[in-house]
């Protein structure tokens, strides 16, 4: 393997300009807004083979450089879709104007996560053209991460596997830093499952409760039990799993009618002690006990946003930590904080770590990112690529 050195500047792509170009694309999820077309044209110009992997109307882009299947394959995952802007009158700038003021770039998606996509694309273009590695570099971008669509990153991974394309390692460019770029990376995230409870009793007149079976006491008792039951005490890298009661509803406008049904919603975030199946079994034990106690029927439908993912500390996380420390001067802590990300679709394919900017203004009015941070992230990604392909089999 050739010794890899720092890239020269002749193939430089300005990550700030690319971020601005992407922000100007109005990509409120799941609209493509020409962002993937822009990326595809740029990457193709610099030697990447690009293919759209759209599924059920969801836009996705797969780009790969290199044809050496005997070498290692390194992947980057990100998204170009953004959340809605809310009321434009609340913004002090054009949400899609990409205005730069006093070293700050403003716009929806500037933090989450068009700057991350731009930084890696710029770093990868320089790397593969100036120090071509023995291996392949993949850039997998979806236009529907914010909706949690199963036709986004998951569709790309399924297409890769169906076409015998396997990455050895992936990084995801979500904002992971806490206060300053490089202070944290994510090696895992909690799983998320929403449970929709429906308790069914017997409707009746509130003046004759003996002729009815009110489902509300059963629901109240059940929810109290959930509130008092700790799922676990946490693990080495994860905080305790949590259950939040987010809705309670009878749909009953009459004050003198005992309702036939009542409903509640549970939002459960679970750590690496659990799978979604184990969580549902735990919920079922509680609902069966309430059925027996109150003589009601309880159904529990669910929506799984994603399983918990965890990449144990090892060669990949150390390489990323070392690269970040070399470029920023601080060694990032390994965390599992936050909600779910598209890493949940990648962790069964290969080891995955998340590394990106700070996220203090993501999804907020006047979302913005420091120009200096975008440039710094590009250098971090460039260092990761050089160290990865120059590690002589250490990872």
Swiss-Prot record:
Function: Catalyzes the hydrolysis of N-succinyl-L,L-diaminopimelic acid (SDAP), forming succinate and LL-2,6-diaminopimelate (DAP), an intermediate involved in the bacterial biosynthesis of lysine and meso-diaminopimelic acid, an essential component of bacterial cell walls.
Family that this chain belongs to: Belongs to the peptidase M20A family. DapE subfamily.
Keyword match Amino-acid biosynthesis: yes
UniProt-annotated catalytic positions: 81, 145 (proton acceptor)
Protein's name according to its UniProt entry: Succinyl-diaminopimelate desuccinylase 2
Positions contributing to Zn(2+) 1 binding: 79, 112, 174
Enzyme Commission (EC) number: 3.5.1.18
Cofactor(s) recorded in Swiss-Prot or TrEMBL: Zn(2+); Co(2+)
Signal peptide positions (record): none
One Pfam family named in its UniProt record: Peptidase_M20
Subunit: Homodimer.
GO biological process: diaminopimelate biosynthetic process; L-arginine biosynthetic process; lysine biosynthetic process via diaminopimelate
UniProt keyword annotations, A-Z: Amino-acid biosynthesis, Cobalt, Diaminopimelate biosynthesis, Hydrolase, Lysine biosynthesis, Metal-binding, Plasmid, Zinc
Binding-site list for Zn(2+) 2: 112, 146, 363
Xref: HAMAP family: DapE
Lineage per the UniProt record: Bacteria, Pseudomonadati, Pseudomonadota, Alphaproteobacteria, Rhodobacterales
């Amino acid at each position: 393997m050739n010794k890899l050195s720092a890239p020269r500047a002749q193939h430089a792509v300005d990550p700030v300009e690319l971020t601005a170009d992407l922000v100007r694309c109005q990509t409120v999820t799941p609209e493509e807004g020409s962002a993937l077309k822009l990326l595809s044209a740029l990457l193709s110009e610099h030697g990447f083979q690009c293919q759209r992997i759209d599924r059920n109307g969801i836009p996705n882009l797969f780009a790969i450089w290199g044809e050496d299947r005997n070498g290692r394959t390194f992947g980057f995952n990100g998204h170009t879709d953004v959340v809605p802007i809310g009321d434009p009158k609340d913004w002090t700038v054009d949400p899609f104007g990409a205005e730069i003021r006093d070293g700050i770039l403003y716009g929806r998606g500037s933090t989450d996560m068009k700057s991350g996509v731009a930084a890696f694309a710029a770093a990868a273009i320089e790397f593969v053209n100036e120090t071509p590695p023995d291996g392949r570099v993949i850039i997998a971008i979806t236009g529907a991460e914010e909706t949690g669509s199963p036709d986004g990153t998951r569709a790309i991974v399924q297409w890769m596997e169906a076409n015998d394309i396997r990455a050895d390692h992936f990084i995801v460019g979500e904002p992971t830093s806490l206060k300053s770029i490089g202070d944290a990376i994510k090696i895992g995230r909690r799983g998320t499952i929403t449970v929709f409870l429906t308790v069914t009793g017997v409707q009746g007149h509130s003046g004759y409760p003996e002729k009815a079976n009110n489902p509300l006491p059963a629901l109240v008792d059940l929810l109290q039990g959930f509130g008092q039951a700790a799922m676990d005490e946490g693990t080495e890298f994860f905080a305790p799993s949590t259950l939040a009661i987010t809705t309670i509803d009878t749909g009953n406008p009459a004050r003198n009618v005992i309702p036939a049904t009542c409903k509640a919603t549970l939002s459960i975030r679970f750590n690496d002690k659990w799978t979604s199946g184990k969580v549902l079994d735990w919920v079922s034990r509680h609902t069966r006990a309430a059925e027996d106690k109150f003589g009601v029927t309880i159904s529990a439908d669910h929506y799984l946003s994603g399983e918990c993912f965890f990449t144990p500390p090892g060669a990949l996380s150390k390489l990323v930590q070392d690269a970040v420390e070399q470029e920023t001067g601080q060694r990032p802590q390994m965390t599992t904080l936050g909600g779910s990300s598209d890493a949940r679709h990648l962790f069964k394919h290969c080891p995955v770590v998340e590394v990106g900017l700070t996220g203090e203004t993501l999804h907020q009015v006047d979302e913005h990112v420091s120009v200096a941070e975008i440039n710094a992230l590009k250098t971090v990604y460039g260092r990761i690529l050089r160290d990865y392909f120059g590690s002589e089999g250490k990872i």
